[in-house]
Swiss-Prot record:
Name by which UniProt lists this protein: Large ribosomal subunit protein eL39
Cited InterPro entries: Ribosomal_eL39 (IPR000077), Ribosomal_eL39_CS (IPR020083), Ribosomal_eL39_dom_sf (IPR023626)
GO molecular function: structural constituent of ribosome
GO-annotated biological processes: translation
Record keywords: Ribonucleoprotein, Ribosomal protein
Lineage: Archaea, Methanobacteriati, Methanobacteriota, Thermococci, Thermococcales
Family that this chain belongs to: Belongs to the eukaryotic ribosomal protein eL39 family.
One GO CC term, this protein: cytosolic large ribosomal subunit
Keyword Ribonucleoprotein among UniProt keywords: yes
């Protein structure tokens, strides 16, 4: 990936990085472990973003 990125691409990558987090612990506790997995979780090597 280029060091000099266009701002729009940088913002898209930042949004994807923020979305790619685990389910918060308080949600797991509140739902009695019914909600454990995050369906939109993305692994950097397996699933690539559209750029």
């Amino acid at each position: 990936m280029a060091r000099n990125k266009p701002l729009a691409k940088k913002l898209r990558l930042a949004k994807a990085a923020k979305q790619n987090r685990r389910v918060p612990v308080w949600v797991i506790v509140k739902t009695n472990r019914k909600v454990m997995t995050h369906p939109k979780r993305r692994h950097w090597r397996r699933t690539k973003l559209k750029e």
